[in-house]
Swiss-Prot record:
Belongs to the eIF-2-alpha family. eIF-2 functions in the early steps of protein synthesis by forming a ternary complex with GTP and initiator tRNA. Residues 12-83 form the S1 motif domain. Keywords: Initiation factor, Protein biosynthesis, RNA-binding. SMART domains: S1. NCBIfam families: PRK03987.1-1 (NF003062). Heterotrimer composed of an alpha, a beta and a gamma chain. InterPro entries: NA-bd_OB-fold, S1_domain, S1_IF2_alpha, TIF2_asu_arc, TIF2_asu_C, TIF2_asu_middle_sf, TIF_2_asu. This is Translation initiation factor 2 subunit alpha. SUPFAM superfamilies: eIF-2-alpha, C-terminal domain, eIF2alpha middle domain-like, Nucleic acid-binding proteins.
């Protein structure tokens, strides 16, 4: 379980949330980095475009990237927005989330070895490394390569150091794989370029959340009307499935938006 130093997030914070309940007027989500704290996502904050059915955008148990827009510290309530998260913020958060998950797994296993709680691990290891270096998992990876001094200098208690280094060595970053596909994209729409961008943006929604091993996805032109779709991850099977899903999304959404998309090569 992931533990945060603060009971409530701050306004403007970008977080990973899990959709729990979807209603006509909005959705209740839980904030994964705040112990499953419940937050409200209003209908007006779901999408910047008109959406006929909120369930076309939000599905229960799916993870989404949200921005905190209101916090009532007296009542302990939090409101979040989906539409205020930029593509760049979403990409960076997904990468950060994968690091947090790796950190959480390492701390869980080490705390079990030491017969201590996961909260102890976060307080005595993760928070100390964060205070000293900013990024706990990067600090642990440095310690695996450079030695225990990295941990000692951050004030990590001695009892954690040896088992932490041993466990972290088993979880060093996996080798990356890249899957690519070629497509052609054509449209006779007046605002063709904007329409194509919208189709591509919709096709990529939630891909990185649906496949945990996916690190990055990108669609870019290699000379109109040809485009390349790149999927980078640590699991070849997931990367292949994600690529197929993206291309399927592109074709389906393209038909709805009068954009003709065909596969040249996978």
């Amino acid at each position: 379980m992931i533990y945060s130093r603060s009971r409530l997030p701050s306004e403007g914070e970008i977080l990973i949330a899990t959709v729990k309940q979807v209603f006509d007027y909005g959705s209740y989500v839980t904030l994964d980095e705040y112990g499953g704290l419940q937050a409200f996502l209003p209908w007006s904050e779901v999408s910047s475009k008109w959406v006929k059915n909120i369930r076309d955008v939000l599905k229960e148990n799916r993870k989404v990237v949200v921005k905190v827009i209101r916090v009532d510290r007296r009542k302990g309530t939090v409101d979040v927005s989906l539409k205020k998260v930029t593509d760049d913020e979403r990409r960076k958060k997904n990468l950060q989330w994968k690091k947090i998950q790796r950190l959480d797994k390492i701390l869980e296993l080490v705390s079990q070895q030491l017969k201590l709680s996961e909260k102890d691990a976060w307080e005595q290891v993760a928070w100390k490394l964060e205070a000293k270096y900013g990024d706990p998992i990067s600090a642990i990876e440095r310690a695996v390569k450079e030695g225990e001094k990295i941990l000692i200098d951050a004030g990590v208690p001695e009892i954690w150091i040896k088992p932490l280094l041993e466990e972290a060595a088993k979880h060093t970053e996996e080798k990356k794989v890249k899957m690519s596909g070629l497509i052609t994209v054509k449209t006779s729409e007046p605002l063709g370029v904007q329409k194509i961008k919208e189709v591509m943006s919709k096709a990529l929604e939630n891909i990185e959340q649906d496949y945990e091993s996916i690190l990055n996805v990108k669609i870019y032109t290699i000379g109109a009307p040809r485009y390349r779709v790149d999927v980078v991850g640590t699991n070849p099977k997931d990367a292949s499935e994600a690529l197929n899903q993206i291309i399927s999304n592109l074709i389906k959404i393209g038909k709805e938006e009068n954009v003709d998309i065909s596969v040249v090569k996978k």
